[in-house]
Design a protein with these regions (language model features):
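Polar low-complexity intrinsically disordered regions enriched in Ser/Thr and small residues
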Residues: 308, 321, 345-347
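Short, flexible loop/turn segments with low-complexity composition
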Residues: 170-175, 308-318
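Conserved P-loop NTPase motor core of helicases/translocases
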Residues: 316-334
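Core catalytic lobe of class I
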Residues: 1-296, 334-348
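Conserved SAM/SAH-binding loop
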Residues: 16-21, 314-322
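Short alpha-helix boundary/capping motifs
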Residues: 136-137, 280-281, 304-306, 312-313, ...
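Short, conserved SAM-binding/catalytic segment
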Residues: 2-9, 298-313
């Protein structure tokens, strides 16, 4: 196996290597769940390594390479268990969009997975406009020609299952007790049901959490709840080195894994999925091709449970100071409108 570096402990094993150098050597039917965000073809270049999926010549070639990885994940996944893929629609030209999630679904079904569900993750369109300089999201376009405007892109999580029969059920015998998100659990529910030992069908705290997790749109994912990532960024990368939010990972691991399950992430990045798996009492296997990302992941995992950061949304990568693009709404007003919008969606 062409491994540049590695760190193997009792709770996790991470490899600085091309995932296709590592995955074929893992045991079939050994992974309880996989959670990851694949490279987005034609969107970013993460490194100059020819093995990097971001260095493909075309979108179609990127999907062909990705198919090999999906096939391996299918082989590794235990029967009845799941894989969760974070993705989004991709740009096609300067205005139109490509259905990347649809192609991911097709590729997984080709490998043998069954498509289970899709959850949308809400993102503030104004912040997206600032971060990406997406002119089609500018309010001034509504005034000038709304035929040129578009809807802000959501993130998605696609969930797939291998077969049906699960040899080890994922059980929450005392219901759901912790919540990953910006909403505050009503105090009355916490007081009455935190240590509830009766009929769990009547556990209203667990019901409240489940109702939010089962929602087709996750409205309160904290976009700034991340792992440290700045040290992994190299020249000209700051705008797209942004790890997957820990709230998303925590929800998926809660729903689709048991303690001590082995959780796989073939695109480790700075270690977010592996970190959360270890923090939640799971085991983790991860691969990362880029040395700077791997070093940051190694550092983050060495402090699992005590390294999370909270980044303000206007401080995320690519969110420079206000400039000529921000000709519609000043930051203070946009933040105020955002708070009002979020509070209006917190009713359950």
């Amino acid at each position: 196996v062409a491994v540049i570096n590695q760190k193997v402990t009792e709770n996790y094993a991470i490899y600085n290597s091309d995932c296709m150098e590592v995955l074929p050597g893992l045991e079939s039917n050994s992974i309880g769940v996989s959670v990851y965000s694949p490279p987005f073809p034609e969107m970013y270049q993460y490194s100059n390594d020819p093995r990097d999926m971001s260095n493909v010549a075309t979108y179609e070639e990127g999907m062909q390479q990705y198919q090999f990885i999906i096939n391996e994940i299918f082989r590794l996944t235990r029967p009845g268990r799941l894989t969760c893929v974070h993705c989004m629609d991709l740009k096609r030209g300067s205005y139109f969009q490509r259905d990347f999630p649809g192609d991911i679904i097709e590729a997984h079904e080709k490998a043998g997975f069954n498509f289970v569900c899709r959850v949308s993750i809400w993102k503030d369109p104004w912040l997206i406009a600032r971060r990406t300089r997406m002119k089609s999201l500018r309010h001034k376009n509504i005034c000038e020609d709304s035929a040129t405007v578009r809807i802000g892109p959501a993130d998605y999580v696609l969930v797939f299952k291998k077969g049906w029969n699960n040899d080890e059920k994922i059980v929450h015998a005392t219901g759901l007790k912790t919540y990953a998100g910006a909403k505050e659990i009503p105090e009355e529910l916490v007081r009455q049901f935190k240590n509830y030992s009766g009929d769990q069908r009547k556990n209203l705290l667990s019901h409240w959490i489940w109702r939010n997790y089962a929602s087709p749109v996750w409205m309160d994912i904290r976009s700034g709840r991340l792992l440290p990532y700045n040290e992994a960024a190299e020249t000209e990368e700051e705008k797209h080195v942004c790890p997957l939010q820990l709230d998303v990972i925590e929800r998926l691991l809660t729903l689709y894994s048991n303690p001590n399950d082995v959780c796989l992430t073939p695109f480790l990045g700075v270690g977010s999925e592996a970190y959360m798996a270890v923090k939640m009492g799971r085991k983790a296997i991860g691969t990362e091709l880029k040395p700077s990302y791997f070093r940051q992941a190694e550092k983050n995992l060495s402090k699992a449970g005590d390294v999370e950061i909270i980044v303000e949304e206007n401080e995320l990568p690519g969110m420079e100071e206000e400039d000529e693009f921000d000709d519609d709404v000043p930051t203070w007003l946009a933040n105020s409108l955002d708070r009002q919008f979020r509070s209006s969606t917190n009713e359950v």
